[in-house]
From Swiss-Prot:
Organism per entry: Streptococcus agalactiae serotype V (strain ATCC BAA-611 / 2603 V/R)
Function as written in the Swiss-Prot or TrEMBL entry: Specifically methylates position 2 of adenine 2503 in 23S rRNA and position 2 of adenine 37 in tRNAs.
Disulfide bonds: 113-349
Protein name: Probable dual-specificity RNA methyltransferase RlmN
An example Gene Ontology CC term for this record: cytoplasm
């Protein structure tokens, strides 16, 4: 059964149970194994939002489900739709805390970026996600619920669109919430549930080297991305506090272990900050840094979304990005400049949540 986490006490979401845990719970409460399979089917294939909609489940067992669980624990607070089809959601958790989820329309399908923590303690100096420190982890049910509510949003439109890809790149450090994230990955990848292919799922870490090694041994065939953002220790430590604990030597040793163990490619995320990490010399350093794993690595150059609280940073001009890209390509680095999404809404990760919390505080002051 689910282990206790630092999540506050309230009725848990049934999404927090893996299929095996749901089977065990049903048997423990006097039902056959197939009953759990029926419930799983209602949750992930028919995608009901209430136990009362499960028409082939007895009223007594539905009452037991209602007594012990909720289906979806999230409340939709705000939805912002961009002209390019990007949708940003602000969800409220049962304890009143807020999280963000983003739906991006890609040429290959609908991709959802999920949040794994309320706030973030990694402390990257350019990032909106860390403006509010970590308050708690999300449990795996709260992470799964984000996917289910986004899918419900599209189900209600009746166009037959389905979430096909997941990126675990929202607020928080996924590997700082390792157990819940791993259960989430196995739930959404389950062939009897949402059945989102492992190669359609990407987990991004800021560089917790020991967790990268652990993840290599889990047998999950999802994609791994590393938020790199600088090609040397001095620069990386100045903009990403995590580098002081896991410097590049330790990080790249873990990445090499991951590649050797899984034979999977690693993507490096690199935000382009004007005059900070975007010189041709920085590009050459990056090419040299990744040379040993070039065949199984990829660099994603990311245009910076300005954050008012971090006004010391600005976006690299297009010509600087192109010059950086050219140096990488000349060195044989597989790289791309990321396509932007949702630039006409609160685009930066964590920005919608931060702005909403500011407005809520201002309203509270006015009401005093």
């Amino acid at each position: 059964m689910p282990k206790k986490t630092d999540t506050p006490a309230y009725k848990p979401s049934i999404y927090s149970l893996t299929r095996d845990e749901l089977i065990a719970w049903a048997i423990e409460h006097g039902e056959k194994k197939f009953r759990a399979s029926q419930i799983w089917d209602w949750l992930y294939k028919k995608r009901v939002q209430s136990f009362d909609e499960m028409t082939n489940i007895s009223k007594d067992f539905i009452a037991l489900l209602n007594e012990n669980f909720v289906v979806n624990p999230l409340k939709q607070r705000i939805v912002q739709e961009s002209a390019d089809g990007t949708v940003k959601y602000l969800f409220e958790l049962p304890d009143g805390m807020l999280i963000e989820t983003v739906l991006m329309r890609q040429h290959y399908g609908l991709s959802v970026c999920v949040t794994t923590q309320v706030g973030c303690n990694i402390g990257c100096t350019f990032c909106a996600s860390g403006l509010i420190k970590k308050q708690r982890d999300l449990n795996n049910g709260e992470i799964t619920a984000q996917i289910m509510l986004v899918q419900k949003y599209f189900d209600e439109r009746g166009q037959g669109e389905r979430v096909s890809h997941i990126v675990v790149m929202g607020i928080g450090e996924p590997f700082d919430n390792y157990t819940n994230v791993l259960k989430f990955l196995r739930t959404v990848n389950d062939d009897n549930g949402l059945a989102i292919g492992a190669r359609h799922i990407t987990v991004s870490t800021s560089g917790l080297a020991h967790k990268i090694r652990e993840f290599a041994n889990e047998g999950v065939q999802v994609n791994l991305a590393v938020s790199l953002h600088a090609p040397n220790n001095d620069l990386r430590s100045s903009i990403m506090r995590i580098n002081r604990s896991f410097p590049l030597e330790k990080l790249f040793a873990a990445i090499e272990y991951y590649i050797e163990t899984t034979n999977r490619r690693v993507t490096f995320e690199y935000i382009m900050l004007n005059g900070v990490n975007d010189t041709p010399e920085n590009a050459q350093e990056l090419a040299d840094l990744t040379k040993k794993i070039r065949k199984l690595s990829y660099v994603n150059l990311i245009p910076y979304n300005p954050v008012s609280e971090h006004d010391q940073y600005s976006r690299s001009p297009k010509e600087r990005v192109e010059a950086f890209y050219d140096v990488l390509k000349k060195n044989g680095v597989n790289c791309v400049v990321r396509q932007e999404h949702g630039t006409d809404i609160d685009a930066a990760c964590g920005q919608l949540r931060s702005n909403t919390m500011k407005r809520d505080r201002q309203k509270a002051k006015v009401g005093q």
